[in-house]
Amino acid sequence: MKAVLIPGDGIGREIAESVREVSAALNTGIEWQEFAAGAESAAESGELIAPGTLDAIEACGWALKGPTATPIGKGFRSINVQLRQRFSTYANLRPVHTLPGVPTRFDNVDLVIVRENTEDLYKGIEYMLNDEIANGVKLITRPACEKICRFAFDYARKNGRKKVTAVHKANIMKLTDGLFLRTFREVAAEYPEIAADDCIIDALCMKLVQKPEQFDVLVAPNLYGDIISDLCAGLVGGLGFAPSANIGDSTRIYEAVHGSAPDIAGQDKANPSAILMAFAMMLNDLGETDKAAKLNAAILAQVEEGKVVTADIGGTAGTKEFTRAIISRLAE
């Protein structure tokens, strides 16, 4: 089968090469079609997303991407946001769990974040009223709320999860977040076997750093989902172990949550675990469940052993050496 590979910026090319090598070692038979996107692509060709990229993704429906840089406060819109809106990948799925061998304050985190991916403040509707006043529109619609809430409950049912928690700020934003919360409760009533509750976003942040094991599935509007995704990654060792899937009706785009890390780009220092875990999510959705499980097991075993690991978790191995170690475990 064909799938699109977008290395992205910074460390993207190095970790994308890890994916290629691991894919070959697993004999997946995937034919990778590589395209450029991001700041480096713009500098080289004048195009943020290389010509042919969108057509290729639409044709095959599957893509795996590395990190892309986004300028702060000015410049072009996030490539991630553009891709999500272009392909209506309405659900961003981010599993978070403790990894043996990674030093953290918690040893029992196992939760999933389901983030609405297409609207909210990320719709990009903002403008200057004058030189001193900027305005941004928080767009929340019932269809999008219903779709993401139903996705969260369906995911919980399919994966044996027991509770879904809605994340909101409806005490202040009574119309927008109020609509999200009301829709959540309506959908929850259709899944009586799954517990449903809700939590205000600021209170949730406190509870996550106090007792994260009390949460199972978190469903959130776009902005809150983005914020708590990084928070939860910090609970389990950082963004080096944070994969995600952007899921639409006909397209799925998998990626690591972390950034492009330009400070270590080209130095063979990047931890490829997150993008390899995202690749495992992709394999699982392709029906290659045994290969996905084998890859996840290899990553977990390598990290738990702690001998050949990257600097972000206390090791001295480079990207290439760590990847070779994973491939060796796949051959066992």
Residue ranges and their predicted role:
Residues 2-8, 63-67, 164-170, 278-284:
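Short glycine-rich or small-residue beta-strand-to-loop segments that form or flank ligand, phosphate
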Residues 4-26, 130-202, 214:
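Glycine-rich phosphate/diphosphate-binding loop of Rossmann-like nucleotide-binding domains
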Residues 9-12, 61, 114, 152, ...:
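Buried hydrophobic positions in well-ordered alpha/beta secondary-structure cores of metabolic enzymes
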Residues 19, 23, 184, 208, ...:
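Buried hydrophobic packing segments
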Residues 30-52, 208:
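N-terminal beta-loop-helix "entrance" segment that forms/cooperates
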Residues 31-33, 159-168, 191-199, 288-296, ...:
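Flexible, glycine/charged-enriched surface loops at secondary-structure junctions
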Residues 39-43, 207-307:
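Glycine-rich phosphate/nucleotide-binding loop
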Residues 42-135, 223:
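N-terminal glycine-rich phosphate/adenylate-binding segment common to multiple enzyme folds
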